[in-house]
From Swiss-Prot:
It is found in: Nucleus. It is linked to Hypotrichosis-lymphedema-telangiectasia syndrome: A syndrome characterized by absent eyebrows and eyelashes, lymphatic edemas of the inferior members or eyelids, and peripheral vein anomalies. The modification Phosphoserine is found at residue 70. It holds the Pfam family Sox17_18_mid. Its main location: nucleus. The gene is SOX18. Residues 87-100, 111-123 are annotated as: Interaction with DNA. Residues 166-231 are annotated as: Important for transcriptional activation. GO terms for molecular function: DNA-binding transcription activator activity, RNA polymerase II-specific; DNA-binding transcription factor activity, RNA polymerase II-specific; RNA polymerase II cis-regulatory region sequence-specific DNA binding; sequence-specific double-stranded DNA binding; transcription cis-regulatory region binding. This is Transcription factor SOX-18.
Amino acid sequence: MQRSPPGYGAQDDPPARRDCAWAPGHGAAADTRGLAAGPAALAAPAAPASPPSPQRSPPRSPEPGRYGLSPAGRGERQAADESRIRRPMNAFMVWAKDERKRLAQQNPDLHNAVLSKMLGKAWKELNAAEKRPFVEEAERLRVQHLRDHPNYKYRPRRKKQARKARRLEPGLLLPGLAPPQPPPEPFPAASGSARAFRELPPLGAEFDGLGLPTPERSPLDGLEPGEAAFFPPPAAPEDCALRPFRAPYAPTELSRDPGGCYGAPLAEALRTAPPAAPLAGLYYGTLGTPGPYPGPLSPPPEAPPLESAEPLGPAADLWADVDLTEFDQYLNCSRTRPDAPGLPYHVALAKLGPRAMSCPEESSLISALSDASSAVYYSACISG
């Protein structure tokens, strides 16, 4: 890195001003003169001889006749207004010229507008004979005006813009606009949720950023597109239809008939059930057809645990928690309704197949259907 010389970058002495008498301009002689002058010269230095600054003249007024600000221009304008060619008077103006003066002298306190109304009313009351001299005078003035001003053309004055451009008041609206009205209330005044519902804003852009509540997961979400949904079959009035899954019931009602079809025969049939895979299509083909029943969808019933049957994949671990009495409320091995009043849960097995079946065949079919439905239902729930 190179170093600059000591004198480089130092501030030079300011140049001597030529307009000052005390500035050194002639070498050392000027310095010696200043020192020889003594303290008196230092005490009273000479005043700097600055050039005389030009004096500011007062602002001149604009040229006369320019921008229309001169009095002469205003006078000329007034003279032009007064000297402009006026229209010739009609008969009413000729008559009202003298009549107005007479009414003004008789009624000095009346306004000019009131006098004009009085003159107009009085002119209409005159008959044609009384108006004739004024009509002739107006015709003479028109002919004289035409002679004096042959190139005259009537140019009506423009109306003031203030009358056309009326300012809108804060409460004044345009003709095509209507004041905003609150939406009608379809419900009467109520407390709680009803009032909150009525106070909600209308559906529109306010709901774009809001999300609707997510519904609970349905058992049908796990079904494949090709699989059929489960719908309960229509039931006759004398038969009890399938109840919703885990419907509320009294546990004591299921134990009133221990010797009926809810007991050992159904459990024995479930223990000796054949493989369930071939009968899965039969279960969904027979019971999976949608009917006119408008009620909610119900998942397939659960199956009790099997003792000697082969486990059906990961669903076999869940069968140990299934209660046998909970599954018995959905199936009934008898075709007729029992006489016991405490058994309201029955299903007519005559509607499960196209032909009549005996009791052993019904038991085996019931067990096969229960195994197939349980396997498909649990596999769909686990995979979903």
